[in-house]
A protein has these predicted regions:
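Catalytic cores and adjacent flexible loops of soluble metabolic enzymes
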Residues: 1-11, 15-199
Length: 199
């Protein structure tokens, strides 16, 4: 139903990176002519080497995924590690690779910069009223960062400012009503120690 209702990219993931749990969803997305994007749930530990990630990426490509997303749900991927990971994945597979991270630990914008320089195809961002903290880096900041470089997005900052102006009072209402917790909008460097996702 998602594809029939207009969703074009179906991001599919298993928090334990057990690809057997993804096969049915990938087949269904392919059957319905959707874009099956399989996410690799990024985490840290001795087992999670570049070989681990590249093997998984190849398996995902062979499964029929249209693209891969590095899903860094806790904001653990550090900038220079992003360079290594993206470089390895881009060599391992032919399909596009996207990066999704959270600003929880405070390093996300730097991670995106290094990932883009390493050849990542897409980065996930959020409009500034809802950016940072457990969300993503601000769209406007990333657009301005890459302006005039080979990575220039071509997006119009005036239009982005209008969009941000539209959403700012919605954010303020959500804060005032308690729907949005202000604690979620800050940085907690301890995330790099306890490694629990917050986004």
């Amino acid at each position: 139903k998602s594809i029939a209702n207009g969703i074009d990219i179906i991001r599919i993931f298993d928090c334990m990176n057990d690809l057997r749990n993804l096969q049915t969803a990938v087949k269904a997305a392919n059957k319905e002519k959707g874009h099956a994007q399989v996410a690799l749930s990024y985490t840290l530990g001795d087992a999670y080497t570049l070989d681990y990630w590249t093997k998984m990426a190849k398996d995902v490509e062979n499964m029929g995924a249209d693209s891969i997303c590095i899903k860094d749900m806790a904001g653990l991927l550090l900038p220079y590690k992003a360079t290594e990971l993206v470089t390895a994945l881009k060599k391992a597979v032919k399909i596009p690779v996207q990066l999704h991270t959270h600003y929880t630990s405070g390093v996300a914008s730097m991670t995106y910069l290094k990932a883009v320089e390493a050849g990542i195809d897409v980065i996930d961002t959020a409009m500034s009223p809802f950016a940072l903290g457990t969300s993503q880096p601000a769209t406007e900041v990333m657009v301005e960062t890459f302006k005039g470089t080979p990575y220039d997005t071509g997006l119009d900052q005036k239009l982005l400012a209008e969009i941000a102006d539209y959403f700012r009072p919605i954010r303020d209402d959500a804060l005032e009503s308690g729907l949005l917790n202000p604690k979620n909008m800050g940085v907690n460097i301890k995330t790099l120690l306890y490694q629990v996702p917050g986004g």
